[in-house]
């Protein structure tokens, strides 16, 4: 299962979170965000991270040429689109960047109708991410996604669950998508509906961009106690 911690701004925290067990770190490339980090600082952090951890840049309605430049300069190996990017944009982007760069498209879910957008994007992206809808903010709001809405979500693409996840509620959320019993969170779990992992930001923070390592460790302790359905 993928465990992505988003909103990394500090080298020591990024290294510690990777050591604790995260499989992916997210870097916010949106200047207006309180979690914004410059491409230069992203590069400095990435150079000191383990090779096997995914490094994802988060963008909102980016220009493709600027995005491509940031990917090249920072060595990100994935990008997350968290704005109003169209399927046509995603298709153009797919043909403009290397095939080994993962494209994640975030969808902000307010009602079951919003899930229908997933089918439109799946041909052009690698992974979907479901986040809670907020009328003013695009992400990192701490608002919990209504899990009932996505119980019948059956995409063909892998997808990540976000939206107000915390060490306290994460196991309850994940239980809805577990297919096969395992004993350790590090094992290769089997999930239904192509659920592939979780994405947290505010749920493991002291303040925007300042990760709380106590909360991160508590998250992994919670995941380790996960009782898997048969």
UniProtKB/Swiss-Prot annotation:
What PANTHER family does the record tag this protein with? N-(5'-PHOSPHORIBOSYL)ANTHRANILATE ISOMERASE
Q: Which GO terms describe its molecular function?
A: phosphoribosylanthranilate isomerase activity
- GO terms (BP aspect): L-tryptophan biosynthetic process
Question: Hey, which pathway is this one from?
Answer: Amino-acid biosynthesis; L-tryptophan biosynthesis; L-tryptophan from chorismate: step 3/5
Q: Name one Pfam family in it.
A: PRAI
- Lineage start: Bacteria, Bacillati, Cyanobacteriota, Cyanophyceae, Oscillatoriophycideae
Q: Could you tell me what reaction this enzyme catalyses? A: N-(5-phospho-beta-D-ribosyl)anthranilate = 1-(2-carboxyphenylamino)-1-deoxy-D-ribulose 5-phosphate
Q: Which InterPro entries match?
A: Aldolase_TIM, PRAI_dom, RibuloseP-bd_barrel, TrpF_fam
- The protein depicted here goes by the name N-(5'-phosphoribosyl)anthranilate isomerase
Q: What is its EC number?
A: 5.3.1.24
Q: Which family does it belong to?
A: Belongs to the TrpF family.
Organism of derivation: Trichodesmium erythraeum (strain IMS101)
Task: Keywords in alphabetical order, please.
Answer: Amino-acid biosynthesis, Aromatic amino acid biosynthesis, Isomerase, Tryptophan biosynthesis
């Amino acid at each position: 299962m993928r465990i992505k911690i988003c909103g990394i701004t500090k080298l020591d925290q990024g290294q510690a979170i990777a050591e604790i067990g995260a499989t992916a770190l997210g870097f916010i490339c949106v200047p207006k965000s309180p979690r914004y980090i410059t491409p230069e600082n992203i590069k400095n952090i990435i150079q000191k991270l383990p090779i096997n951890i995914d490094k994802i840049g988060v963008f909102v309605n980016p220009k493709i040429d600027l995005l491509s430049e940031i990917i090249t300069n920072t060595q990100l190996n994935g990008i997350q689109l968290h704005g109003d990017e169209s399927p046509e944009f995603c298709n153009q982007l797919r043909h403009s960047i290397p095939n080994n760069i993962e494209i994640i498209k975030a969808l902000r879910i307010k009602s079951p109708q919003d899930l229908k957008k997933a089918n439109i994007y799946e041909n052009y992206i690698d992974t979907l991410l479901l986040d809670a809808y907020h009328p003013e903010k695009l992400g990192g709001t701490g608002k919990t996604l209504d899990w009932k809405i996505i119980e019948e979500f059956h995409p063909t693409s892998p997808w990540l669950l976000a939206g107000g996840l915390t060490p306290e509620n994460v196991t309850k959320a994940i239980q809805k998508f577990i297919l096969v019993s395992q004993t350790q969170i590090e094992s290769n779990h089997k999930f239904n509906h192509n659920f592939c992992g979780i994405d947290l930001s505010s749920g493991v923070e002291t303040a925007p961009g300042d990760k709380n390592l106590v909360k991160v460790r508590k998250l992994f302790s919670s995941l380790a106690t996960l009782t898997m359905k048969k």
